[in-house]
Regions:
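Short, ordered loop/turn segments at secondary-structure junctions
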Residues: 18-20, 71-72, 98-99
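Phosphate-binding/switch loop-helix module in NTP-utilizing enzymes
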Residues: 44-96
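Helical mechanochemical/support elements of P-loop NTPase systems and associated helical scaffolds
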Residues: 22, 49, 77-80, 84, ...
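Short, well-ordered secondary-structure micro-motifs
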Residues: 26-29, 54-57, 78-79, 105-107
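Phosphate-binding/switch region of NTP-binding enzymes
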Residues: 86-157
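Conserved P-loop
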Residues: 1-51
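Conserved catalytic network of the ASCE P-loop NTPase/AAA+ motor domain
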Residues: 6-9, 37, 58-61, 85-89, ...
Length: 157
């Protein structure tokens, strides 16, 4: 969601919250990230078939950035995801995936990972770039400073 807010500086964002819907933690995150600051540029949907998504994206002034949370819960398979991206080559698709043993869960998600230009893995509130355009090896973006402190072994006494 934090990335979605930043992307609002460059165009409209469609956040497809299939996994969380708009549950309490989603609403809390909307609050502490001050998503009201990008009201109108950050749109959230909680359901919709692939056909409905395609129809939405064909409309004039449709979102430039599409965040799908998550690939597994969306219920699409790999060929459908590829078709969606090929149908709208000027749009940016961001796929969120569930993990199993530090890898995207399911064969379709693993295949999708390898055709994406940029892969970002978030571990312990740190986002590591694993894509084709990585910066310094081992560098990361801090997603939530307090979360890093709370999950580290160096807790204040």
């Amino acid at each position: 969601m934090q990335l979605g807010k930043e992307l609002c500086n460059y165009g409209t964002v469609l956040y497809m919250s299939y996994e969380e819907k708009i549950n309490q933690s989603f609403q809390r995150r909307m609050g502490y990230l001050k998503m009201n600051e990008v009201q109108g540029k950050f749109r959230v949907v909680t359901e919709g078939s692939l056909e409905e998504v395609i129809a939405r994206l064909k409309k004039p002034k449709s979102p430039k950035f599409i965040i799908i949370d998550s690939f597994q819960v969306a219920g699409w398979d790999y060929p459908q995801a590829v078709e969606l991206m090929e149908t709208f080559p000027k749009k940016c698709f961001i796929w969120i995936s569930q993990e199993k043993k530090s890898q995207p869960m399911g064969g379709g998600a693993v295949r999708l990972k390898y055709i994406c230009d940029m892969k970002i893995r978030v571990v312990g509130y740190k986002a590591y770039c694993q894509g084709r355009a990585i910066g310094d090896p081992g560098s990361y973006y801090v997603v939530w400073e307090d979360g890093i402190i709370q999950t580290s072994n160096n807790l204040p006494k």
